[in-house]
């Protein structure tokens, strides 16, 4: 584990321990609504404080971009962390174990390091550019399925911005007719990690934020998968529209999506 990932893991583990304690008494967790179907809790905020303080102490010249508190540090910094202190807040607030901490490091705008930590399962997904992806120190690879009708596809509903909902449901219906099934588990970082481990053969979602997908996308890429936007291009981090899959399935997924967008 390199120094960047070591720092990220230690911070994520501390934040995760706080989450586990909070999950034992959810009635005491204070929650606000940022928008329709978009919640933030004091657990999100406390996790972010732990992560930001650890990164600032270790790397005072790095920029840090967070879901809740925005940007910290110099805008022109060569290194930038993108972090989601609690991906899957709604799951967490309902006692569902599918939530995670997501941390990615960019150097001059290029993703270099990624860590996704799932506290309930104590699962640690990591990747370094050019060095592969790991789950709990074991190398992971995307699936090798070819036939779309045998594939399990992950997705996420556009519940915050519902302007895409009608179009999305048409796309989802098409996928359900042509695959072995679809799953909506409520935490994009873990959905992407499921692609990286082969539990999902592919994943697609619209209108996500950089902190939702930056870390998980690099983990997919380093596990042998491909990540694109809905047009098959590389603009997914900017647009928030993302498709991730094993190389044999990606084109088939893009064909379904392109028929409706």
Swiss-Prot record:
* EC number(s) on file: 3.1.3.25
A GO MF label: RNA binding
So where does substrate get bound?
67, 86-89, 183, 212
Q: List the disulfide bonds.
A: none
Q: Which enzyme class, named as a word?
A: hydrolase
Protein name, per record: Putative Nus factor SuhB
Q: Which gene encodes it?
A: suhB
- Needs which cofactor? Mg(2+)
What species is given as this protein's source? Answer: Neisseria meningitidis serogroup A / serotype 4A (strain DSM 15465 / Z2491)
State the protein's purpose.
Might be part of the processive rRNA transcription and antitermination complex (rrnTAC). The complex forms an RNA-chaperone ring around the RNA exit tunnel of RNA polymerase (RNAP). It supports rapid transcription and antitermination of rRNA operons, cotranscriptional rRNA folding, and annealing of distal rRNA regions to allow correct ribosome biogenesis. This subunit may play a central role in organizing the structure.
């Amino acid at each position: 584990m390199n120094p960047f990932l070591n720092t990220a893991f230690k911070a994520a583990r501390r934040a995760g321990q706080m989450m586990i304690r909070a999950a034992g008494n959810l009635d005491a967790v204070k929650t606000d609504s940022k928008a329709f179907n978009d919640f933030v809790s004091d657990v999100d905020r406390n996790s972010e404080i732990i992560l930001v303080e650890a990164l600032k102490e270790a790397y005072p010249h790095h920029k840090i971009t967070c879901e809740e508190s925005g940007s910290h540090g110099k805008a022109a910094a060569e290194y930038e962390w993108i972090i989601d202190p609690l991906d899957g807040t709604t799951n967490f607030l309902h006692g569902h174990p599918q939530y995670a901490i997501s941390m990615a490091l960019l150097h001059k705008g290029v993703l270099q390091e990624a860590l996704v930590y799932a506290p309930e399962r104590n699962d640690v997904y990591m990747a370094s550019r050019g060095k592969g992806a790991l789950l709990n120190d074991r190398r992971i690879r995307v699936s090798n399925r070819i036939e779309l009708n045998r594939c399990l596809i992950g997705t996420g509903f556009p519940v915050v911005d519902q302007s895409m909902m009608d179009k999305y449901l048409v796309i989802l219906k098409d996928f359900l007719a042509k695959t072995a099934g679809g799953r909506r588990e409520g935490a994009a970082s873990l959905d992407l990690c499921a692609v990286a481990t082969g539990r999902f053969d592919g994943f697609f979602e619209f209108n996500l934020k950089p902190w939702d997908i930056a870390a998980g996308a690099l983990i997919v890429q380093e596990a042998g998968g491909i990540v694109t936007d809905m047009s098959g291009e590389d603009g997914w981090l900017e647009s928030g529209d993302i498709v991730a899959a094993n190389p044999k399935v990606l084109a088939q997924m893009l064909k379904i999506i392109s028929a409706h967008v």
